Each structure stands twice: as C-alpha cells, then as structure tokens.
C-alpha cells in the first residue's frame, strides 16, 4: 500500500507544472531633447517592506557602481522608516552632488492559475496501434505570478522626469534574482539612451 502511494505521489509530481521565470521590458520612455549624461545617482525604492527596499537599492547601487558611476542608496542616508517625499529626498541629497534620482515602484502583483489541457501522443507507434490511448500526457494546473515594476529617472537639478522603464517578471523565483535582472535592464537601457 505504501509503495502504491509513493508511486502515485511521484506520478502526480511529474505532472505538476514548474513554470519558468522570465523578465521582460514592457516599454521605456525618454524626455524629448534631454541630452545630459549623468554620473551620480541616488536610488530610491518605494517598496512597502523595508527589507525589500534596502535590498533593491543595494543591488541597483552596486550595478551602477560596476559601470563606474557614483551611486548611493536612499536607505544609507535616510532612516528606513522616514517618509519618502520631495522634501525628505531633497534634504537627504542636499550635499551629495547627485545628478539623477532613480525611483522604483511596484505597480502590481497578479496571481492566476491556468489549466494546461492534455496533449495527444503524435508518435508513429501510436498511429499504427489503434488500441493505444490518444492522450498520453494528462492536463495540469499552472500557477503564475506576474510582478510589474516601474523605474523612473529624475534630473536632480530640474526635478523633471527624464526617463522611465516598465518591466514585468513572470513567476519570480526570488526577490534577488528579479532585482538583478531588472538592474541589468535599467543600466542597459540608460546606456543605450546615452544617459550614462
């Protein structure tokens, strides 16, 4: 009986879906006629959870530094529990010689389940063996999570939005991997636009 239960559990596990994770840049925008190259950034994450805020800012700062740029996390110069608004940000970066402010925000998290129907066996063996079942792989449920983030860049002198990127991650494996991927996408896009 125990062996049958184990075999049944293994068969069910083999049918379960393990969806893959991927991040896609949904779009970007840049202000017309903005031609300033920036070299010093303050990174702000508007995450509700302090741990996620600190982690994202740290990953983005490190990625910018890999490009030879100066970057500082807001959580390094502002208390984590301090409200983030125009006044507190200006005060925190007053003596820091910051060119641009990168602000990330979570736009949404969507969770859904998708039924993947059974697939037919189209092998030659099945074609000639009419007694064989037509369906060899059962249907299953695939659970998906979709996380959408937006990263905005403000010119610190004019305080105007000069660039924005929206990215979406399907089935994020963990926060760190998502942030690593998005920080690479941000740097790649900033470089392609001549902003760094």
Where are these regions (language model features)?
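N-terminal segment of the mature soluble domain
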Residues: 38-113
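Bacterial N-terminal signal peptides that target proteins for export
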Residues: 1-5
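Short, low-complexity, polar/charged sequence segments that are solvent-exposed and flexible
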Residues: 60-65, 91-93, 120-125, 170-173, ...
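C-terminal/domain-edge helix-coil "capping" segments
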Residues: 15-39, 48, 136-196
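Short low-complexity stretches enriched in small and charged residues
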Residues: 26-31, 55-69, 119-121, 193-196
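Surface-exposed short loop/turn segments
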Residues: 84-153
